[in-house]
Regions:
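Extracytoplasmic/periplasmic terminal helices and flexible tails
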Residues: 1-99, 103-245
Length: 245
């Protein structure tokens, strides 16, 4: 039996087209990874120029912005390569370590919100204690009225957190934005944390129990930034020296 030449042509065209589709998909995947990395670098560059993340020197001068500010924060992009969200204390593993200038105690955030604090480092990797842990205690505040407290997580829903320490004489509107306060120096002031969803009084105490919805979906998070406060040692040394006053 003789197979028509047209059949050979059709079969060859099919396999050729399939190979091109596979090659295109693979190329697209790697291009997407490269584009994501480039976007991270661009976001990092832009954040480093935001005036609220800089330390103002010439506060009464408006002659030249660059001479009036010193960069206070540096940002190092990193990708999550392993994570947990269902345990009582959850961690993220990042593909950046000591060779990138990472050390214990640095803050980690994403384009959507706060992620956690570096807990341990090796040469090439870092372990992040995420906001989904029992003792995270990040200082946060309510936008609009400036009320501040500590971010907590009760171990139940990875999408929701709690704020403690705000007295119930302060009105806390539902849907208020929650942001970092910046008091510890780990995070700059004003990074997104989430929104207030519920406010209830704590029985026998003069404080609120405040429920928030996190702005970041930690179950699908991949790209992060590690933040380094260039003035942190100066700030903590001053505070430690004057603790008794």
């Amino acid at each position: 039996m003789t197979v028509p030449k047209s059949s050979y042509f059709t079969t060859a065209s099919y396999f050729s087209g399939t190979l091109f589709e596979i090659r295109h998909a693979v190329t697209k995947h790697f291009n997407l990874e490269e584009n994501n990395h480039n976007l991270q670098l661009e976001n990092m560059r832009l954040r480093s120029q935001v005036p609220s993340y800089l330390y103002e020197i010439g506060r009464d001068s408006i002659i030249h912005v660059d001479s009036n500010y010193h960069q206070q924060y540096q940002y190092i992009p990193a990708t999550i390569i392993n994570s947990t969200i269902t345990k009582r204390n959850n961690f993220f593993t990042l593909n950046a370590g000591r060779i990138h200038g990472i050390r214990k105690g640095l803050g980690v955030f994403s384009s959507n919100g706060v992620v956690g604090i570096i807990h341990a480092c090796s040469e090439h990797f870092s372990l992040v204690k995420s906001v989904l842990t029992s003792d995270i205690n990040i200082d946060v505040m309510i936008e609009g009225n400036g009320a501040f407290g500590l971010l907590k997580w009760d171990g139940k829903n990875p999408n929701n957190g709690q704020i403690s320490g705000i007295t119930n004489d302060i009105k806390i509107p539902i849907n208020s934005n929650v942001v970092t306060r910046g008091g510890s120096g780990i995070f700059p002031r004003g990074l997104t944390v989430g929104k207030v969803t519920k406010v209830t009084p704590v029985e026998g105490k003069s404080v609120w129990r405040i429920e928030i919805q996190f702005s970041e979906k930690y179950a699908v998070l991949e790209n992060t930034y590690i933040i380094k406060n260039l003035f942190l040692n100066e700030m903590t040394a001053l505070q430690t020296k004057n603790e008794g006053y």
